Amino acid sequence: MYDLLKTIDDPADLRRLDRRQLQPLADELRAFVLDSVSKTGGHLSSNLGTVELTIALHYVFNTPDDRIVWDVGHQTYPHKILTGRRDGMKTLRQFDGISGFPRRSESEYDTFGTAHSSTSISAALGMAIGSKLNGDDRFSIAVIGDGAMTAGMAFEAMNNAGVSEDAKLLVILNDNDMSISPPVGALNRHLARLMSGRFYAAARAGVERVLSVAPPVLELARKLEEHAKGMVVPATLFEEFGFNYIGPIDGHDLDSLIPTLQNIKELRGPQFLHVVTKKGQGYKLAEADPVLYHGPGKFNPAEGIKPSATPAKKTYTQVFGEWLCDAAELDARVVGITPAMREGSGMVEFEKRFPERYYDVGIAEQHAVTFAGGLATEGLKPVVAIYSTFLQRAYDQLIHDVALQNLPVVFAIDRAGLVGADGATHAGAYDLAFLRCIPNMTVMAASDENECRQMLHTALQQPNPTAVRYPRGAGTGVATVKAFTEIPLGKGEVRRRTSQPDGKRVAILAFGTMVAPSLAAADALDATVANMRFVKPIDAELVRELAQTHDYLVTVEEGCVMGGAGSACVEAMMEGGAVRPVLQLGLPDRFVDHGDPAKLLAMCGLDGDGIAKSIRERFLNHAANVASPAKRVA
């Protein structure tokens, strides 16, 4: 099994193969990807769709001297396997294992780290220009999907690249007609307009009826139809940017890919190759439902993904999705916005029930935020559902277009904190710090499912921009209450009171997901725990009361310490005059790698044991560690 694949330790081995061996190699590589992902979990559909393209690129180009930049990067498993990491696939996305995305520190073949969308053309152009300035004769290649091409950054790069006539730059559009959510907007409609016109559809149907008795001729007509799709675009779009457009060609046909790429190597100036692929190619279940198989956990390939036998705890994403539908039912002004993450953000049901109030703006976070601001000026109640890591891409719009004008936009910030297998590129480590410094913002962090629901309701009532952050995955198991209750603005709550005497009284001020482990630590130490709820406005009154009645304060957040929620507590304490020693716990000042979320939190000292250990070492000097009975306040 994998007889050919076992002989490939790097692309030089690949280039020694006879062309006739490449398709059998592709079959083995596709089977290996499927087997590997089924055992570790990871991105599947996209990787099954890039097998032949990956082989062709490494076969034709002299990698790593020629540079390949993979946009988004979750489709790089075939690339990793062919570049010396075949045996490492068993550790994919696991702690101390190989990343699910390209990483420069992992391999010289990973020429540029990616994970966020639409960055590849800019990076590849920089490499092409840099190589020219250094006197190096090499190609720089950007592989970008049709979903990523909807983002403004991709067109900014193309606009810049088009005037670089001597750059050895190749942009490959991997057109699979499906990003995570279906591509949207004028560009994708433009690509499809010729093929969906009434006259064209009627003519095609008539021709197919006539040619149905001649299958070879019908197949020729279908191929001509595919090429007609490409005829519309170059003259009006890609070539207007200064690129030489080639395609579309079948991205699964090595006999088409390899000669085309070999010809492109002889050309100068920016080249644009349009390849058509299919997500899930070669695995019928993934072909039929590429969204389901976009990022599965472990599964049996023979049976496919099966629903969980026992109902799991409700995820925070589900809590958000249910709240949004309930809020929209009560208020016709509520609208939902997602930057191409309908499934991931829990908006599938909302789209079905309220299609006229659902806006998928594509991979366009900047536009999403300013679009929401515009809606707010007309009296609507926009809710932007966005991952913490992707909100970073729209920071200027958040400040300039929303906060500066004090517009009532709700930001439902998913994937806050560590995200596990996706690693540092997708972690929501910075939102508390970069949000709390913005005037007019209200910022909340949910500690359980019901609190998340009620915070979202509270956010919708505010006259200013408001953010609610919540983590990836399942909640604590707390039931959500259907009835809405507005949480008092800027008010936390004490969840546990210490019974320790003066000199040993510790108060833990916990935010969001850190409330549960802080309570566990407090049980071991007999400490007070406050669920702070609000990062901005911080509950200054509660902070000062705890400072006055305790000897030590500890702040705990699942975010960066510098400028974060703990800093807000320290500022409030200092202003109150009752200064106490403070220990600020949070994510370390480094990028936290991929792995099991619970293990990562423990590694960062943010589980119950880690929090207790840090407090003992800092304040209690290893003495009096026996806890008295817990005293929690409802």
From Swiss-Prot:
Naturally occurring in which organism (per UniProt): Burkholderia thailandensis (strain ATCC 700388 / DSM 13276 / CCUG 48851 / CIP 106301 / E264)
Q: Which superkingdom is the protein from? A: Bacteria
What are the annotated disulfide bridges? none
UniProt name for this protein: 1-deoxy-D-xylulose-5-phosphate synthase
Q: In which pathway does it act?
A: Metabolic intermediate biosynthesis; 1-deoxy-D-xylulose 5-phosphate biosynthesis; 1-deoxy-D-xylulose 5-phosphate from D-glyceraldehyde 3-phosphate and pyruvate: step 1/1
State the SUPFAM superfamilies in the record. Answer: Thiamin diphosphate-binding fold (THDP-binding) (SSF52518), TK C-terminal domain-like (SSF52922)
Cite the CDD domains for this sequence: TPP_DXS (cd02007), TPP_PYR_DXS_TK_like (cd07033)
Its needed co-factors are: Mg(2+); thiamine diphosphate
One matching Pfam family is: Transket_pyr
Q: Please list the GO biological process terms of this entry.
A: 1-deoxy-D-xylulose 5-phosphate biosynthetic process; isopentenyl diphosphate biosynthetic process, methylerythritol 4-phosphate pathway; terpenoid biosynthetic process; thiamine biosynthetic process
Q: What does this protein do?
A: Catalyzes the acyloin condensation reaction between C atoms 2 and 3 of pyruvate and glyceraldehyde 3-phosphate to yield 1-deoxy-D-xylulose-5-phosphate (DXP).
The UniProt similarity line reads:
Belongs to the transketolase family. DXPS subfamily.
Q: Does the keyword Isomerase apply?
A: no
Cofactor note (record): Binds 1 Mg(2+) ion per subunit.
PANTHER family, sorted: 1-D-DEOXYXYLULOSE 5-PHOSPHATE SYNTHASE-RELATED, 1-DEOXY-D-XYLULOSE-5-PHOSPHATE SYNTHASE, CHLOROPLASTIC
Q: HAMAP family this protein is in?
A: DXP_synth
| Its EC number(s) | 2.2.1.7
The gene name reads dxs
- GO CC annotations, alphabetized: cytosol
Q: Which InterPro entries does UniProt cross-reference here?
A: Dxylulose-5-P_synthase, THDP-binding, Transketo_C/PFOR_II, Transketolase-like_Pyr-bd, Transketolase_BS, Transketolase_C, Transketolase_CS
State the Gene Ontology terms under molecular function.
1-deoxy-D-xylulose-5-phosphate synthase activity; magnesium ion binding; thiamine pyrophosphate binding
Q: How does it assemble?
A: Homodimer.
The entry marks the following residues as binding thiamine diphosphate, namely H74, A115, H116, S117, G147, A148, N176, Y283, E365
Checking NCBIfam families in the record gives:
dxs, PRK05444.2-2
Which keywords does the record carry? Answer: Isoprene biosynthesis, Magnesium, Metal-binding, Thiamine biosynthesis, Thiamine pyrophosphate, Transferase
Q: What class of enzyme is it?
A: transferase
The record lists Mg(2+) as bound by D146, N176
* Keyword Chloroplast belongs to the record: no
